[in-house]
Structures are given as structure tokens and as C-alpha cells.
Curated annotation (Swiss-Prot):
ATP binds at G453, P454, P455, N456, T457, G458, K459, S460. Residues 162-328 are annotated as: DNA-binding region. It is found in: Host nucleus. It comes from Macaca mulata papillomavirus 1. The modification Phosphoserine is found at S89, S93, S107. ATP-dependent DNA 3'-5' helicase required for initiation of viral DNA replication. It forms a complex with the viral E2 protein. The E1-E2 complex binds to the replication origin which contains binding sites for both proteins. During the initial step, a dimer of E1 interacts with a dimer of protein E2 leading to a complex that binds the viral origin of replication with high specificity. Then, a second dimer of E1 displaces the E2 dimer in an ATP-dependent manner to form the E1 tetramer. The keyword S-adenosyl-L-methionine does not apply. Gene3D superfamilies: 3.40.1310.10, P-loop containing nucleotide triphosphate hydrolases, Zinc finger, large T-antigen D1 domain. A motif (Nuclear localization signal) lies at residues 83-85. This is Replication protein E1.
Length: 625
């Protein structure tokens, strides 16, 4: 690149461009007026820009700016309302951090001028400021209900009553955002008690219950007076209270319907009777285990503010009567054992289920359900009941036992089907009676009866029906590998071994000869010591004739064999031709009582029973107050 000031010409785009100025006038020439430089001040360009358009445009922007300012102010006020802040003096903090000060109170704007930056943190105060104008941190607004009523309901469901200028209509008064909260609040203000304290909540409208509590608002006074007569066809018990308020009559009803109903059915029924909309009613079932609720119904029922029809429900009586209250607090195991003994319940599950169902009518059962040791009580009750039953059974003779079984069996049986079945099988009835007499007495060598025959001849049907009537025990050879398979014989008056096979007969021939004799044997019991006992009469059914088989020749003299040869008959409907049940066996033993040489009891109790009634409940001493 050439140095600066080089006179040489450049080449291309970098070359120097030489222009020679054209001078038309020289120094000393006369200048004309048109070319005078002193007059060239730019005055001729004053009107070069037209300002008329600008003034017109400025006049159009003023309304827009005003509208923008108004909208901005409106938006700011809306935001302030939503944030629940005051729009007034800046000295009032939205958080309520207001400290009284003379300068601030006199001139809040002057107090805002400060050189020090104040702290924005809230300070704790011992006393809240109270200017008398009711300034609060949260801005609350009252919801005025449409209509001429005098009830204002706040957003939270609370209410403030004001004098009513005109007649109020419950239909219009209850048109609010939270209808149920309004009804509950009005109920508490009228009756002085919360509706939820008297009832328990059902989430489903289709849950069935017999007892219902109804709170209806806006009922006409004439309808409320006639409800006592209108509701009688539907209820067996009704407790009616009617109190007036600015909505009309607020009715409270506790009703026990004749059949179980759900909330929808009760709502339709009461809406028809009271001429009130279903949405204007509170319907819930009562609290059955609340002593306070039961006491409320009891106290109001005996006062003059209520009308009561029917008998008081048992859940009210049980919790309000003094005697019932004492009984509910104490559980007596002896009463439970006595109940299980009287009903012949010895199984734990049956005792627990049946006794729990008595909680509604038995105070001791109710106390049993309230206990935390129900499993222990059930186990102890079943154990004691089995002990009592076993001791009672051991003390009874066979005649007493059969007599007791006959007393517990219903009448109406016939002894003829049993005799006809024996004759159908070719069994001599007189021989059978003779063998049965010795069998029941436990005579040695006559302590076992064997029913032999081909399959489907009714051997098991005949033997099972007899054992069921005599409430005997069943043993099975399938458990012979256990040391305790003969344990049921220790608690039985009569026993049965069904379907003895050749292996079973071999086992009996090897180990149970003395059992068939009716002599004392030793039986091993689980978790207990060995017991020495006399084997009860044993009935055996088999398809093998052990009385004639030479393999078991030592058993021939120890058993009496009856052969069933004919197949068991059925009618065209599949029912047995010869019905063998407890009623027929009762008739059979009553008919053949003397032939079986069963003894009659000479001394009986006043009620005619053969044995003294067992009582395990402790005696009670009556004390006068």
C-alpha cells in the first residue's frame, strides 16, 4: 500500500478520484441579491412540516389513554378485591401489622416519606388494634338469599338472623349454595343440639335400616299436627317434636318402621306425608350405642315437647334404665355356659356365632361383644360345657339316656317302618328285639351287633339312623394308625364302626377282642392320661361275614350277626320307602320299652323329667334399695 500523501494514481477501485472545483466567481466580484449568503437563514423552510395532522392525532389519543388508565385502575381494584386487601390507607398492612402512631394517624402520606428502609417482617403484638369499625384481616361478605326472608347465610355455613319484614318461604330461604350445611346449622339453633350427635352417617342411600331420624324444615303447622295420625300405618314407634322458627315448623322425627327401609324410601314417604321437598330433609339412622343420644330421646320423650306413639325401642331402654346399665357393664361366664348347656352347643364356632346374635336382647351377650377376650370366653365356655355333658352322660343309665333322647325328640313318628324294613330284609323281629335288649345292657359276649350283607342293602342307613337318635359316636378304621382313634369311645353311650373290611376284622381279632366282650379296656387320649373304661355297645356294618369266616374264629362268639340281603327300596321319586328318622325311633322305643326291659324312673321332678335340671349359674341375692 502506498504511503500517505503519495501523488501516484491508484489502480482499480483503490485509485484516487481527482475532481477539479469549478469556480465561477472570484474575489472582488459583485454578488447579486439573489445569491446573498447573509439572508439564507432557513426562514423559507418554516412551513416545510405540516403540524395540523399532529394536532388532530393528539386529540384522538387522549380518549384512548384515558380508557387505558381506567381499565388499569379497574384491574388493580379487582386484584385488590381478590387478594382481600384494603384499598385504603397504606398504613394498614394486609397482614394486620398495624402499630398505632400519632404521626401515622394524623398524616399517613407524610409518614410514608422516610429515608430509612423499614422492615417488612411481621411483629408480634399482645393486643390487636380495635378502631371500632370492625376492620378484619379477611374480608367476609354476606350472602343475601333471594326472597323476602330474614336469613343471611355466610359462605362458611354460619347464619345470622335478622328481623323479617315480610312472610318467609322455606322454598326460597333454602336456595343457597350449601343446603345441607344450612339445614344442620338451623337445626342446631332451633333444638340446641347438633344433628350429627343423634345420628350415624350412612354413605349409601340404599342401605336398609328399621330406625330412622328425620329432620324436615318448612313444614306447615297443620301438617305437623296431623303427622301423629298419618304416620301410624307405617311405624310401630314414633317420636315427634315440632319447634317453630322463621322458616316455619322444623320437625324432628325418630321412627321405627314396621319393615326395613332405605333412605330413598323414607325420603319419598316423608315427602308425601309432610308435603316437603326431599332436599329440605335430613335423614339418617340413629346412634344405637350412644348413651347421650339415648338419654336425649328418653328425656324429650317424657316431656311435653314431644308426642310419642308405640313402645320405646330396646336400644333406648337398655341404655337409660339403671338396672340395664349395671348389667351391661359386667360379663358373667356362667350365664354363657348355662345357655350353651341348655342348647346342647359344644362347638366353639357355633357357640360364638349363636351367642353373638343374642346381643340385642341379652345384656350378658352384649357385654360379651364389648369384651376384648371373646375368643378366650368362647373356648372356656365350650370346654366347661363338654365337661358338664360328659359327667352327666356318665351318671346316666342307658334307660335314662334313651328317655332323655326321647324327650328331646318331637312327636309324630311311627314305629311301623322300622319293623317293616327288618321284615323286608328277612330279619326276625323277635330275635332282633332280644339281641337289642342285651346290646343296650352291655352284656358280655352280646355287646356287639354286626349288620352283614351285600352293598346297597341299607345297612349303613339303618345303623346311622339308630346312632343319630341315641347320639352315639362314630369311629373309622382309616385312623387306625393313630394311637387316639378309639378316643371317641370314652365319651359315648353307643358307638358304630361303619364298613369293616377284612383288614379291619384282622385288627379287631388281634387287638379288640375284649372291646367286643364289653369288658374294661384302656384307651389312649390325646394330651391326656390313659383312661380305663368299659367299651360301649358297638354296632358294626360290613360286607364280610366275620361270624362265619374261619380266619376270625375267636370273634364268632363275641358278636350277633344279622343279614340284610335285599337291596334298599326307593319310590318313583327317589325317596326311601322305609323312612328311618328320630321320630320313628322314638315311637319304636316307646312301643317296645317293656320288651327291651328298660327301667322306668320312679322318682321324677315336678316337671316330670327323669333327672334333675342342671344349673351352673350362681345364685343371686335380692337386695332392697
Amino acid at each position: 500500500m502506498d504511503p500517505e500523501g503519495t501523488p501516484g494514481e491508484g489502480v482499480g477501485c483503490t485509485g484516487w478520484f481527482n475532481v477539479e472545483a469549478i469556480v465561477e466567481r472570484k474575489t472582488g466580484d459583485v454578488v447579486s441579491e439573489d445569491e446573498d449568503d447573509t439572508e439564507d437563514t432557513g426562514i423559507d423552510l418554516v412551513d416545510f412540516i405540516d403540524d395540523t395532522c399532529g394536532s388532530v392525532q393528539t386529540g384522538d389519543e387522549a380518549p384512548g389513554a384515558l380508557l387505558h388508565a381506567q381499565e388499569t385502575q379497574a384491574h388493580a381494584e379487582a386484584v385488590q378485591v381478590l387478594k382481600r386487601k384494603f384499598v385504603g390507607s397504606p398504613a394498614v398492612s394486609p397482614l394486620g401489622n398495624y402499630n398505632p402512631c400519632v404521626d401515622r394517624d394524623l398524616s399517613p402520606r407524610l409518614n410514608e416519606i422516610s429515608l430509612n428502609q423499614g422492615s417488612g417482617q411481621a411483629k408480634r403484638r399482645l393486643f390487636l388494634p380495635d378502631s371500632g369499625y370492625g376492620n378484619t384481616e379477611v374480608e367476609t361478605s354476606l350472602l343475601q338469599v333471594a326472597g323476602g326472608g330474614g336469613q343471611d347465610v355466610q359462605a362458611g355455613g354460619k347464619e345470622n338472623t335478622r328481623p323479617d319484614d315480610g312472610g318467609g318461604d322455606a322454598t326460597q330461604l333454602l336456595r343457597c349454595s350449601n343446603l345441607k350445611a344450612t339445614l344442620l346449622s338451623k337445626f342446631k339453633s332451633v333444638y340446641g343440639v347438633s344433628f350429627s350427635e343423634l345420628v350415624r352417617s350412612f354413605k349409601s342411600d340404599r342401605t336398609t335400616c328399621a330406625d330412622w331420624v328425620v329432620g324436615a324444615a318448612g313444614v306447615h303447622h297443620s301438617v305437623a299436627e296431623g303427622l301423629k295420625q298419618l304416620i301410624q300405618p307405617f311405624c310401630s314407634y314414633a317420636h315427634i317434636q315440632c319447634l317453630t322458627c322463621d322458616w316455619g315448623v322444623y320437625l324432628l322425627l325418630l321412627a321405627r318402621f314396621k319393615c326395613g327401609k332405605n333412605r330413598l324410601t323414607v325420603s319419598k314417604c316423608m315427602s308425601t306425608l309432610l308435603n316437603v321437598q326431599e332436599t329440605h330433609m335430613l335423614i339418617e339412622p340413629p346412634k344405637l350405642r350412644s348413651a347421650a343420644a339415648a338419654l336425649y330421646w328418653y328425656r324429650t320423650g317424657i316431656s311435653n315437647v314431644s308426642e310419642v306413639i308405640g313402645e320405646t325401642p330396646e336400644w333406648i331402654t337398655r341404655q337409660t334404665m339403671f338396672q340395664h346399665g349395671l348389667e351391661d357393664s359386667i360379663f358373667d361366664l356362667s350365664e354363657m355356659v348355662q345357655w350353651a348347656y341348655d342348647h346342647d352347643f359344644t362347638d366353639d364356632s357355633v357357640i360364638a356365632y349363636e351367642y353373638a346374635q343374642l346381643a340385642g336382647i341379652d345384656s350378658n351377650a352384649a357385654a360379651f361383644l364389648k369384651s376384648n377376650a371373646q375368643a378366650k370366653y368362647v373356648k372356656d365356655c365350650a370346654t366347661m360345657c363338654r365337661h358338664y355333658k360328659r359327667a352327666e352322660r356318665q351318671q346316666m343309665t342307658m334307660s335314662q339316656w334313651i328317655k332323655q333322647r326321647c324327650e328331646k325328640t318331637d312327636d309324630g313318628g311311627d314305629w311301623r317302618p322300622i319293623v317293616q324294613f327288618l321284615r323286608y330284609q328277612g330279619v326276625e323281629f323277635i330275635a332282633f328285639l332280644a339281641a337289642l335288649k342285651l346290646f343296650l345292657k352291655g352284656i358280655p359276649k352280646k355287646n356287639c351287633i354286626v349288620l352283614f350283607g351285600p352293598p346297597n342293602t341299607g345297612k349303613s342307613y339303618f345303623g346311622m339312623s339308630l346312632i343319630h337318635f341315641l347320639q352315639g359316636s362314630i369311629i373309622s378304621y382309616v385312623n387306625s394308625n393313630s394311637h387316639f382313634w378309639l378316643q371317641p369311645l370314652a365319651d359315648a353311650k353307643v358307638a358304630m364302626l361303619d364298613d369293616a373290611t377284612p383288614q379291619c376284622w384282622s385288627y379287631i381279632d388281634n387287638y379288640l377282642r375284649n372291646a367286643l366282650d364289653g369288658n374294661p379296656i384302656s384307651v389312649d387320649r390325646k394330651h391326656k392320661n390313659l383312661v380305663q373304661m368299659k367299651c360301649p355297645p358297638l354296632l358294626i356294618t360290613s360286607n364280610t361275614n366275620a361270624g362265619q369266616d374261619d380266619r376270625w374264629m375267636y370273634l364268632h362268639s363275641r358278636m350277633v350277626v344279622f343279614t340284610f340281603e335285599q337291596p334298599f327300596p326307593f319310590d318313583q321319586n327317589g325317596n326311601p320307602v322305609y323312612e328311618l328318622n328320630d321320630k320313628n325311633w322314638k315311637s319304636f322305643f316307646s312301643r317296645t320299652w317293656s320288651r327291651l326291659d328298660l327301667q322306668e324312673e320312679e322318682e321324677t321332678e315336678n316337671d316330670g323329667s327323669t333327672c334333675r335340671a342342671f344349673k351352673c349359674v350362681a345364685g343371686q341375692n335380692l337386695r332392697t334399695v
